[in-house]
């Protein structure tokens, strides 16, 4: 089973969403359920899936601190939809810690995740936040 990076990001989002609800869940078992729902033989977990999920979890406090300044004064991380926050964490992680993912790709993939797992308002919100990030990086 060979997954594209886009599919891996979708699985990473699903894993992080599940781990948000149950932080003590076993990551590897969760990966197996996401990758092989029929529970036949164990499948090899793509390295990039593990990198994203483990990285976002390990750097969550740092990522949240980086996201907060891009929110309007009326918003805090606690007010964000969990889907939006998880997608932003993945994007910020890729932007900061994954060298072989161009900024444009990280932003586009975050918007695609929002289209798949959230609504149009969330897509506009995530796009706006990441647009500010890109503008800041250019300056």
Swiss-Prot record:
Pfam families: NusB. One of its GO terms (molecular function) is RNA binding. One of its GO terms (biological process) is DNA-templated transcription termination. Coiled coil: none annotated. Gene3D superfamilies: NusB-like. GO terms for cellular component: cytosol. The keyword Signal does not apply. Belongs to the NusB family. Involved in transcription antitermination. Required for transcription of ribosomal RNA (rRNA) genes. Binds specifically to the boxA antiterminator sequence of the ribosomal RNA (rrn) operons. This is Transcription antitermination protein NusB. It comes from Lactiplantibacillus plantarum (strain ATCC BAA-793 / NCIMB 8826 / WCFS1) (Lactobacillus plantarum). The gene is nusB.
């Amino acid at each position: 089973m060979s997954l594209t990076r886009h599919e891996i990001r979708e699985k990473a989002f699903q894993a992080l969403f599940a781990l948000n609800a149950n932080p003590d869940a076993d990551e590897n078992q969760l990966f197996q359920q996401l990758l092989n729902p029929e529970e036949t033989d164990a499948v090899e977990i793509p390295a990039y899936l593990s990198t994203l999920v483990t990285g976002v979890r390990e750097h969550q406090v740092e990522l949240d601190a980086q996201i907060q300044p891009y929110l309007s004064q009326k918003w805090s991380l606690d007010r964000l939809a969990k889907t939006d926050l998880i997608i932003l964490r993945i994007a910020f992680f890729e932007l900061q810690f994954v060298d072989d993912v161009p900024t444009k790709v990280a932003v586009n993939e975050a918007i695609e995740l929002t289209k798949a797992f959230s609504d149009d308002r969330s897509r506009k919100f995530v796009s706006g936040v990441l647009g500010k990030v890109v503008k800041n990086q250019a300056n």
